[in-house]
A protein has these predicted regions:
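Long beta-strand-rich cores associated with HINT superfamily self-processing modules
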Residues: 100-234
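Charge-rich, low-complexity segments
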Residues: 3-111, 127, 131, 189, ...
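Non-Sec secretion/translocation targeting segments of pathogen effectors
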Residues: 1-9, 119, 175
């Protein structure tokens, strides 16, 4: 039924749970549904973030409610599918790793994929519906600042459109638009195995190029969205 998703993701009535900060007992409000998906390690690492980072993260997560609700409603009325919605928010563990374990620390507010959605569209409506989503988000003050159309790049083994948006508070979200076929290939074991093999090779060597061609073939053997080259004009 139409209400199934909404209940499962707890977004019809978002519940913000109050978490006290150890340092100065200021209150942080967290989206309860997201927090409940965290492991013990996630909770531990969340508390290892600085207070500012925790507040920023919690605040960020309370803004994603509006986008999630909009995309769920959009999917219901437009034959679209939201894939892996429960994974839309980067966990504290991967966030902590990105901030503290890498050689180059990322600035917290420049992490574009703390909140990431995957939207699967029909090839015939694909371009039109991406425009509908970006227009509607623009109305909600989410402006697009990066649009990558991989369908028109024959040398890169991936098909899809990756769009990044930010609002006036510099919060960022990413939406990946797929067709069912491009999503299935991206998630396939075959593509993953080839990627893992290629990743450790020297770019340009014979074996690297051979594996790359196999990956490119996976992506070229599918129906391409109508008028996909026109998408640059967003």
């Amino acid at each position: 039924g139409s209400g199934d998703n909404a209940g499962f993701f707890g977004i019809d009535s978002i519940e913000l749970k109050c978490v006290l900060s150890a340092e100065n007992s200021k209150k942080i409000y967290l989206n309860k549904e997201i927090e409940e998906s965290w492991t013990e390690e996630d909770i531990e690492l969340f508390h290892k973030l600085s207070f500012e980072e925790r507040v920023f993260n919690a605040d960020y997560l309370s803004t994603e409610f509006e986008i999630t609700k909009f995309l769920v409603d959009f999917a219901k009325t437009n034959k679209a599918v939201l894939a892996g919605l429960e994974y839309r928010v980067k966990s504290p563990k991967s966030l902590y790793n990105k901030l503290y374990q890498r050689v180059e620390k990322s600035f917290f507010d420049s992490i574009a994929d703390v909140i990431r959605y995957t939207v699967i569209l029909e090839p015939k409506e694909y371009v039109e519906q991406i425009r509908s989503v970006t227009d509607a988000l623009y109305e909600k003050n989410w402006k697009i600042y990066s649009l990558k159309n991989y369908w028109v790049n024959d040398s890169f083994p991936y098909n899809g459109v990756n769009a990044k948006f930010k609002n006036s508070r510099n919060y960022r979200i990413e939406i990946q638009f797929h067709t069912q076929e491009s999503f299935d290939v991206k998630m396939s074991e075959e593509d993953h195995k080839l990627y893992e093999q290629r990743r450790v090779l020297e770019p340009g060597c014979d074996e690297y190029n051979r594996i790359l061609q196999l990956q490119l073939k996976l992506y070229s053997d599918m129906e391409y969205p109508e008028n996909i080259a026109d998408l640059e004009k967003i």
